[in-house]
Amino acid sequence: MPVLRTKTSRMWLPDALRGLALLNMLAYHAMYDWVYVFGHESSWYNIWAPGCHVWQQYICWSFILLSGFSFPLAKRPAKNGLIVAGCAAVLTFVTAVFMPSEAIWFGVLHLNAAAVLLTCLVYPLLQRLPAGAGLAASAALFALTNQLPEGYLGFENWRLCAVPTGLYKTNWFWLGLPDLTQFASADYFPILPWVFLFWCGVFLARLWHPGRGEPPAALRPLCAIGRNTLLVYMLHQPVIYGALWVWHTVLG
């Protein structure tokens, strides 16, 4: 998600990967609005189809992992986290007021802000862990808690065991314990399991050191998009919705 920027020479490959994920996000959300908001049929786009699920997961995994990778590179991560938290609050207010059926109560921006601020608190402890061991442990915990919001431990369709239902009555949706009888969010990325994927990125930054400097000319537009992730994220839905509304009502 949002880039934690530095004033030093940037690593261009993470920017390019982030830009690629952003372009996929724009295409995915454009298709979602076209099919599920404006009611058009599609022969291939179905959010419940395995292919679309993999597409959606690639996008969110990329953002969260790269956000974690960017954390150690930031000079003021707490400030960045607070900025993202403010943007997340704006997003919740706007969607709750103007699109209540599509309200976002704890989406990927909220997760990114929470992960950054939480990591600021525990970063000295994370630094004590060997990078390889920390990466492996974070990946294992992410897999183990992947379906915690759905009521069990396990990854995707692999169910290890059910979680006591009483834990969900608190409706701590932000943590990953939603009461699904009363909670709904159009975009939902709770702290558990996703903070563990963020920490995978934090540890990966100690193991992987892409080169710095100018990117290849062909990748410069992609890198430029990747350097402005937060701005693109905040603007993309209004722009996509407006363009599709014109197409639907005027041209369609």
State the predicted function of each range.
Residues M1-G252:
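Alpha-helical transmembrane segments and their immediate juxtamembrane cytosolic regions
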